[in-house]
From Swiss-Prot:
<dbReference type="GO" id="GO:0006805">
    <property type="term" value="P:xenobiotic metabolic process"/>
</dbReference>
<keyword id="KW-1133">Transmembrane helix</keyword>
<dbReference type="InterPro" id="IPR023208">
    <property type="entry name" value="P450R"/>
</dbReference>
<dbReference type="InterPro" id="IPR008254">
    <property type="entry name" value="Flavodoxin/NO_synth"/>
</dbReference>
<keyword id="KW-0274">FAD</keyword>
<dbReference type="Pfam" id="PF00667">
    <property type="entry name" value="FAD_binding_1"/>
</dbReference>
<dbReference type="GO" id="GO:0043602">
    <property type="term" value="P:nitrate catabolic process"/>
</dbReference>
<comment type="similarity">
    <text>Belongs to the NADPH--cytochrome P450 reductase family.</text>
</comment>
<feature type="binding site">
    <location>
        <begin position="138"/>
        <end position="141"/>
    </location>
    <ligand>
        <name>FMN</name>
    </ligand>
</feature>
<feature type="binding site">
    <location>
        <begin position="596"/>
        <end position="597"/>
    </location>
    <ligand>
        <name>NADP(+)</name>
    </ligand>
</feature>
<feature type="binding site">
    <location>
        <begin position="472"/>
        <end position="474"/>
    </location>
    <ligand>
        <name>FAD</name>
    </ligand>
</feature>
<dbReference type="GO" id="GO:0071372">
    <property type="term" value="P:cellular response to follicle-stimulating hormone stimulus"/>
</dbReference>
<dbReference type="GO" id="GO:0016787">
    <property type="term" value="F:hydrolase activity"/>
</dbReference>
<dbReference type="GO" id="GO:0043231">
    <property type="term" value="C:intracellular membrane-bounded organelle"/>
</dbReference>
<feature type="domain" description="Flavodoxin-like">
    <location>
        <begin position="80"/>
        <end position="224"/>
    </location>
</feature>
<dbReference type="GO" id="GO:0061913">
    <property type="term" value="P:positive regulation of growth plate cartilage chondrocyte proliferation"/>
</dbReference>
<keyword id="KW-0560">Oxidoreductase</keyword>
Length: 677
């Protein structure tokens, strides 16, 4: 409550009698007011705050205790902690594997989410004997930290804490097709050293464009000997199978307490409450699902998700994430081959009672729900899963096969690469090809990684479509080297999501929006050059919609150029009519389309860029922003090389100078990428 202040000088009068009388009255009013306020404060407010103050102290103490990972390590006898920055679950999986490794060397490890702890506590780590901190850090997007490592990254940038005595190691997860390969891992490794921490093993750089699993195994098999040498310890024995979770079967449980696919809060899908994010997705109804292309070879689709009443806000260039479900046919086949009743309700409870992660996925739930909504059953399993499963193969040759692929030998790595990775064998295929391998379904559920959200560039502008989010995607289906037909989880699931008819129920998609740096220029007059073949055109549909909307508002809008590519005009020309209309209306200044298969020689977007190089250079010199969306492995690299050539030729520069010129555009936010591999 604010203090009251009365300026009595304004009451001065020429008549002394009136002045005295007035002052007396004012004093009485002030005195009464002060007495009243004091009475209220002591008798009422104080009583009301006595209990809340005590409660707040308790909460604060609890929060501090939980955020101090060093105190937790002391309490539980741990000396190794592995933090993970993970967007898709792989870094978390690697962290779990490293923490489990520790027991082989007479140590105790724990994996941890940096979002759950105060990393300033690192300076206290030397209080624990033979303490080591390891970071498994993935790089997301264009050199960004993952969502759960953002606070840690911000802290590293701002802090000047002395980390002398802290022993550390870093393994980074990245992709060489991206411009900023492993930026987060490199930054954490460098910054920790700058703050005085001691690196006890070299930085590991995993490449998801190559063989990330092999990169990790190679680093890991050299990492542990270095740890042993540094701390003077020896391995206690061979790697052994240790269960992390205990199975509890619920024979009589209230159905209202069973998870049915929710990502966070129980029954959150029945009682939706904003704000919506990765841990609390919004169930959006599908209002449109139409095929964009004419050919039968591929299925490209446009979906619209209704976000009205969700309070979700997005901007052109943002990403929409959806949580898919696995194919029920695959789930049923898994249940059949394992001889399991998929409708049994169970919980997997962490045997480590001190762990923050009580279950590998929301529990209690049924095996059917876990295999449908929570577990990844379509990606090739990693080597640690094969090692754990090998014990359940009754046929010696199959057990040997699995153990060899899980080994660090050159022969084992090659076998894993060819038999699992390149053949795209998922867990069901492995069980089918190893007839004697029949693990308990609960252990399999413990071993399989979590099914992750899928991200798509939003193909709409919130200025035009504030109550819906649009998705453009190609349905994935292919034949493996082993002759099986594999289908993309999310795209096939989305394909089946038909808008509700008169008598049908609504088709719902759990979703949330992730903010992006892929943004239109602040000034509408700034020219934009957009390059996006295939489904890479998605964010540019939103960009063009927004520029068209600005024109309708009477705003001056700069040149808007699109370089789009597809196979044939009559097969996969996405949004053909919409783009043509934008061009006719003047919202799209130039519409340049490369058809790669309509003539004897291939024509790609970079060829069209070269043809327009003089005009493009003029726009770039005039402050234009360049946007590239689509395949990172080939297209984005070729387009970037083309811009190097354009800058070198028309800017009269050496190649190195042209490269530096484009790099500076990236730094200034004038050359933006939204790419995938």
């Amino acid at each position: 409550m604010g203090d009251s202040h009365v300026d009595t000088s304004s009451t001065v009068s020429e008549a002394v009698a009136e002045e005295v009388s007035l002052f007396s009255m004012t004093d009485m009013i002030l005195f009464s007011l002060i007495v009243g306020l004091l009475t209220y404060w002591f008798l009422f407010r104080k009583k009301k705050e006595e209990v809340p103050e005590f409660t707040k102290i308790q909460t604060l103490t609890s929060s501090v205790r939980e955020s101090s990972f060093v105190e937790k390590m002391k309490k539980t006898g741990r000396n190794i902690i592995v933090f993970y920055g993970s967007q898709t679950g792989t870094a978390e999986e690697f962290a779990n594997r490293l923490s489990k490794d520790a027991h082989r060397y007479g140590m105790r490890g724990m994996s941890a989410d940096p979002e759950e702890y105060d990393l300033a506590d690192l300076s206290s780590l030397p209080e624990i004997d033979n303490a080591l901190v390891v970071f498994c850090m993935a790089t997301y997007g264009e050199g960004d930290p993952t969502d759960n490592a953002q606070d840690f990254y911000d802290w590293l940038q701002e802090t000047d804490v002395d980390l002398s005595g802290v022993k550390f190691a870093v393994f980074g997860l990245g992709n060489k097709t991206y411009e900023h390969f492993n930026a987060m891992g490199k930054y954490v490794d460098k910054r920790l050293e700058q703050l005085g921490a001691q690196r006890i093993f070299e930085l590991g750089l995993g490449d998801d464009d190559g063989n990330l699993e092999e990169d990790f195994i190679t680093w890991r098999e050299q990492f542990w000997p270095a740890v042993c040498e540094h701390f003077g310890v020896e391995a206690t024995g061979e790697e052994s199978s240790i269960r992390q979770y205990e199975l509890v079967v619920h024979t009589d449980i209230d159905a209202a307490k069973v998870y049915m696919g929710e990502m966070g809060r129980l029954k959150s899908y029945e009682n939706q409450k904003p704000p919506f994010d990765a841990k609390n997705p919004f169930l959006a109804a599908v209002t449109t699902n139409r095929k964009l292309n004419q050919g039968t070879e591929r299925h490209l689709m446009h979906l619209e998700l209704d976000i009205s009443d969700s309070k979700i806000r997005y901007e052109s260039g943002d990403h929409v994430a959806v949580y898919p479900a696995n194919d029920s046919a695959l789930v049923n086949q898994l249940g059949k081959i394992l001889g399991a009743d998929l409708d049994v309700v169970m919980s997997l409870n962490n045997l480590d009672e001190e762990s923050n992660k009580k279950h590998p996925f929301p529990c209690p739930t049924s095996y059917r729900t876990a295999l449908t909504y929570y577990l990844d059953i379509t990606n090739p399993p990693r080597t640690n899963v094969l090692y754990e499963l090998a014990q359940y193969a009754s046929e010696p040759s199959e057990q040997e096969l699995l153990r060899k692929m899980a080994s660090s030998s050159g022969e084992g790595k090659e076998l894993y690469l060819s038999w699992v990775v390149e053949a795209r064998r998922h867990i069901l295929a492995i069980l089918q090809d190893c007839p004697s391998l029949r693990p308990p379904i609960d252990h399999l559920c413990e071993l399989l990684p979590r099914l992750q959200a899928r991200y798509y560039s939003i193909a709409s502008s919130s200025k035009v479509h504030p109550n819906s989010v649009h998705i453009c995607a190609v349905v994935v289906e292919y034949e493996t080297k082993a002759g099986r037909i594999n289908k993309g989880v999310a795209t096939n699931w989305l394909r089946a999501k038909e808008p509700a008819g008169e008598n049908g129920g609504r088709a719902l998609v759990p979703m949330f929006v992730r903010k992006s740096q892929f943004r239109l220029p602040f000034k509408a007059t700034t020219p934009v050059i957009m390059v996006g073949p295939g489904t890479g055109v998605a964010p540019f549909i939103g960009f063009i919609q927004e520029r068209a909307w600005l024109r309708q508002q009477g705003k001056e809008v700069g040149e808007t150029l699109l370089y789009y590519g597809c196979r044939r005009s009559d097969e996969d020309y996405l949004y053909r009519e919409e783009l043509a209309q934008f061009h006719r209306d003047g919202a799209l200044t130039q519409l340049n389309v490369a058809f790669s298969r309509e003539q004897s020689h291939k024509v790609y977007v970079q060829h069209l860029l070269k043809q327009d190089r003089e005009h493009l250079w003029k726009l770039i010199e005039g402050g234009a922003h360049i946007y590239v969306c689509g395949d990172a492995r080939n297209m984005a690299r070729d387009v970037q090389n083309t811009f190097y050539d354009i800058v070198a030729e028309l800017g009269a520069m050496e190649h190195a100078q042209a490269v530096d010129y484009i790099k500076k555009l990236m730094t200034k936010g004038r050359y933006s990428l939204d790419v995938w591999s």
